[in-house]
Amino acid sequence: MTTIKATKGEFVNMINGLFAVQELKGKKFSLTVSKNIVILQKALKELEEAGRPSDKFMKLAKEVNELANLNNEDSKAKIDTLEKENEELVKTRQEQMEIVKKMMEEEIEVELNSLEEKVLPEEITAQQINNLIKIIK
């Protein structure tokens, strides 16, 4: 086990790196990756919940995306109108994202399972290793 002190944002990058390599083969490697994903999901649960958009905002975002995908001349105007009609909802989401941004800068300590170099799959890339470097021994 390795205790790592880092920002929540750095741990988000690490969990994304773990998700990116979970298809690689190797029993010990896969087991360690899976265990670390579970540990990081627990450590970042508060961050995930803080960033979850409301159902109302998700509905608005869907409408905006549908309009944007139409590529009509009046799509932009319709999007602007929707955003103005839902100004408070958009403002609340922006404030929510500011809170999440601050949370991403908070430092925490997490104890993760180490990955030994000898269990790294042959097909792992340097880019994938860079996301996991803090837990490789």
Language-model-derived ranges and their functions:
Residues 2-137:
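A composition-driven surface/loop motif
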